[in-house]
């Protein structure tokens, strides 16, 4: 039997790939399990789109929501399209509950990702804004 695991992430706990792999492990080797990650524009979007578009991932250090350094990963396709998750640099999972204040937070790091992708030849940009 073929089983398709097409899941979105579980916010703050598992990526779509981690969740699908856990299901695959639970099913065992008796059945063929096909993993197809999904995303809604938030966390997991880069993973899902890079897999289906055969894009390379690049991780860089950028400015987080409160000027702290964070690592952000984005994808680059062969036709110079960048795949970016806004939440990797300005996501709600990067903010402690007591820090939730949009007037003090910044999205500067998202611009740094765009600039890095541009400097590496990207001229088209897919930017998921979920989870930010």
Where on the chain are the PLM-derived regions?
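N-terminal loops that bind phosphate or other acidic moieties
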Residues: 1-129
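IQ-motif-like calmodulin-binding regions
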Residues: 132
């Amino acid at each position: 039997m073929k089983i398709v695991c097409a899941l979105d992430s579980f916010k703050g706990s598992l990526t779509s790939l981690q969740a699908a792999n856990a299901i695959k492990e639970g099913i065992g080797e008796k059945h063929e399990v096909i993993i197809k990650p999904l995303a809604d524009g938030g966390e997991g979007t880069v993973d899902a789109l890079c897999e289906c578009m055969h894009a390379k991932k690049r991780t860089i250090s950028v400015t987080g929501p409160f000027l702290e350094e964070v690592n952000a990963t984005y994808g680059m396709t062969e036709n110079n399209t960048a795949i970016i998750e806004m939440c990797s640099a300005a996501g709600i999972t990067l903010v402690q509950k007591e820090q939730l204040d949009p007037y003090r937070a910044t999205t500067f790091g998202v611009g740094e990702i765009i600039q890095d992708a541009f400097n590496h030849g990207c001229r088209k940009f897919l930017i998921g804004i979920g989870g930010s």
